Amino acid sequence: MSHCVVLNKLESVLIIGDSRYALSKNEVLLLECLYLRAGDVISHDELLTTCWPDRVVSPTSLPVAIKHIRDVFRKITRSEVIKTYKNEGYSYQKDSVLIIIDDGSTEKESHSAAYTRKEKPDIPIKLVGLQILSHLNSTFFIAIMMVIIIIFFMVGGNDIVSFIDSDTNSVIITNVTTKMNGPTAGLPKVKNSMIFKDDFGLVIICDQSECKQQ
């Protein structure tokens, strides 16, 4: 096999070197069908059904199309590329001319990828990092609170109570049942946080990013 051509199905042309030879849509289907089954004898009826779908064609349509394809191949070879089998059909000869079939799928995929990139711009890495960090901080915060509450239950001799400081909007959790000078006496004035205090004097303040002992 010494020659190679490109069958462009999208443009209905047979490309030989720098030259382009126009084919009809039916001739493109015909050449593709014969080439993909190279070496097989395909009957007239099968070729007509496959390459002229849903159409009533004249008896001369198939031989005329075969002749046109042969004329194009004679630009590069004198060998018989498509052989006629009388009263049987036609066969594309193996090891004659290599055909690369271009159905335009590569171009379509390229356009599709470009459209996807245009419609869905990349999310900034920095923004993604901040979102992940925020999620981890919240998870860490919740885990710490649960651990501290469990510790209160384990070591506290009194019942645990909780209430909201109306001045700071902070949640106070404590097992100190005797509250001198008001329920928030001795506690730091920290807004929008969660404050834990036990009867040993331990005070832990948690916000959405960290927990720290006072």
Curated annotation (Swiss-Prot):
It comes from the Bacteria. It holds the Pfam family Trans_reg_C. Residues 1-94 bind DNA. GO terms for biological process: phosphorelay signal transduction system; regulation of DNA-templated transcription. Residues 1-24 form the signal peptide. One of its GO terms (molecular function) is DNA binding. Keywords: DNA-binding, Signal, Transcription, Transcription regulation. Transmembrane segments: none annotated. Required for expression of pH 6 antigen. This is Protein PsaE. It comes from Yersinia pestis. The lineage of its organism: Bacteria, Pseudomonadati, Pseudomonadota, Gammaproteobacteria, Enterobacterales. The gene is psaE.
